[in-house]
Swiss-Prot record:
Keyword Cytoplasm set for record: yes
Main location: cytoplasm
Catalytic activity: 2-(N(omega)-L-arginino)succinate = fumarate + L-arginine
Protein's name according to its UniProt entry: Argininosuccinate lyase
Family: Belongs to the lyase 1 family. Argininosuccinate lyase subfamily.
E.C. code: 4.3.2.1
Length: 478
């Protein structure tokens, strides 16, 4: 039968017909169930087909495969891609994984030539290549989503460069800041997240294809060619490492975990800020839910779920770390469990980024309430201490003591610092003047924070412009 003629097997094809030559009997139903990964690794179909097409092209170029067989294989792979994307592909659990499902279907379509595609290749380097390609695509998707969230945060920061709010330590009012300044803190966090994903992509971008099972191959393959076709920078230098390495997946999960923590911290603040006790912002209906029993409730469920899902991403990292920690070189079946944590983390992170982007784009800061809260809790006490240092030459530690004593006086009287009379204040520090009263204003406080990275409104506007320029230049290569 010619290589281009479809072959119909006389027995039902299973994975064991691919590797079962040395076995007397097939696997049990339980073995097939625990061994099968098609339920989740079917997501690798685009990458698997791309890797197979690159491998086929190289085999033809090096004379290992005939041009006729190569054309048949490439045509069959294109047809399989179309079938999968149309939802017409006959996936089979008995064929274990996406690689065997595609190979089996290719044999149905083009016959014996399909069996030549696996020349100089193992499932070990095949899956390592597919997985790297998938993670690379996921990194590009996540990085783009983070860039959009960054842009939304910068836009909102520009809008609220002058909006005064309380800054907190220990969740206690600390010093006045601007809402824009607060949002820019998350812009910086997300910038580092983008950098981590970019760095992971750089290290990921070496091709394991051609490593074969673990030792390389005796066929005269061109690994540089397949690497170039697939957009890798180079082939990996060691065949054992090529099939054993999952650092790229761990780095992706580590970057995803840190990004999830940042999203969770912002989500926690939204939960706090939307509470009646704070009342700093209002979430739109699109990102809120109600109660089945309490008609008045307006719950920040989207923010709460972003906060919760960070734990799942962190758990995915822990899961893969534990899988990999004790594995000898090269491939062990444990590594089949490397994909589900990565798939789940990528899906979860992209959903959380989308939810956070939507929330931050549509929240309504309650400007008057923010300003009122900024002046509560003696938040300008540090400004008074700084004035004592600048105007009177008081050592800061003594200035701190004086300001603290004035806070105690105001607290006992049940008033704010700015409500104390100058005469009352002079009972603590006789050298105080009317100028000291001025520094107790929250507006004066934020305007005075002009040091680089500070909260002064002009600083915030300049920081927004700088952030747009800086982070736009950090987009990873596509």
């Amino acid at each position: 039968m010619s290589s281009s003629t479809p072959t119909t097997p006389s027995i039902e094809r299973t994975a064991s017909t691919i590797w079962g030559g040395r076995f007397d009997s097939g696997p049990s139903a339980v073995m097939e169930a625990i061994n099968a990964s098609i339920g989740f690794d079917k997501r690798l179909y685009r990458q698997d087909i791309a890797g197979s097409k690159a491998h086929c092209t190289m085999l033809v170029a090096t004379g290992i495969l005939s041009k006729a067989d190569g054309e048949a294989i490439l045509g069959g792979l294109d047809r399989i891609l179309a079938e999968i994307e149309a939802g017409d592909f006959p996936f089979s659990v008995a064929l274990e994984d996406i690689h065997m499902n595609i190979e089996s279907r290719l044999k149905d379509l083009i016959g014996e030539a399909a069996g030549r595609l696996h020349t100089a290749r193992s499932r070990n380097d095949q899956v390592a290549t597919d997985f790297r390609l998938w993670v690379r695509d996921a990194i590009d998707g996540v990085e783009g989503a983070l860039a959009r969230l960054q842009d939304v945060l910068i836009t909102r920061a520009e809008e609220h460069a002058d909006t005064v709010m309380p800054g907190f330590t220990h969740l206690q009012a600390a010093q006045p800041v601007t809402f824009g300044h607060h949002l820019l803190a998350y812009v910086e966090m997300i910038g580092r997240d983008r950098g981590r994903f970019h760095d992971a992509r750089v290290r990921l971008n070496e091709s394991p294809l051609g490593s074969a099972a673990l030792a390389g191959t005796s066929f005269p393959i061109d690994r540089a060619m397949t690497a170039q076709i697939l957009g890798f920078d180079r082939p990996c230098a060691n065949s054992l490492d090529g099939v054993s390495d999952r650092d790229f997946a761990l780095e992706f999960l580590a970057a995803a975990s840190i990004a999830s923590i940042h999203l969770s911290r912002l989500a926690e603040e939204l939960v706090i800020w939307t509470s009646a006790q704070f009342g700093f912002v209002r979430l739109p209906d699109a990102y809120s839910t109600g109660s089945s029993i309490m008609p008045q409730k307006r719950n920040p469920d989207a923010a709460e779920l972003v906060r919760a899902k960070a734990g799942r991403v962190i758990g995915d990292l822990a899961s893969l770390l534990i899988v990999m920690k004790g594995l000898p070189l090269a491939y062990s079946k444990d590594m089949q469990d490397d994909k589900e944590p990565v798939f789940e983390a990528a899906d979860t992170l992209e959903l959380c980024i989308a939810a956070m982007t939507g929330m931050m784009e549509t929240i309504t800061p309650k400007v008057d309430r923010l300003r009122t809260a900024a002046g509560q809790g003696f938040t300008t006490a540090t400004d008074l201490a700084d004035w004592l240092v600048r105007a009177l030459g008081t050592p800061f530690r003594h200035a701190h003591e004086v300001s603290g004593a004035l806070v105690k006086m105001a607290e006992k009287k049940g008033v704010g610092l700015e409500d104390l009379s100058l005469a009352e204040m002079r009972t603590i520090e006789p050298r105080l003047t009317d100028e000291a009263i001025k520094v107790l204003s929250v507006d004066w406080s934020v305007r005075s924070r002009t040091s680089f990275g500070g909260t002064a409104p002009d600083n915030v506007r300049a920081a927004c412009a700088a952030a747009r320029a800086r982070y736009a230049a950090k987009a990873p290569p596509r």
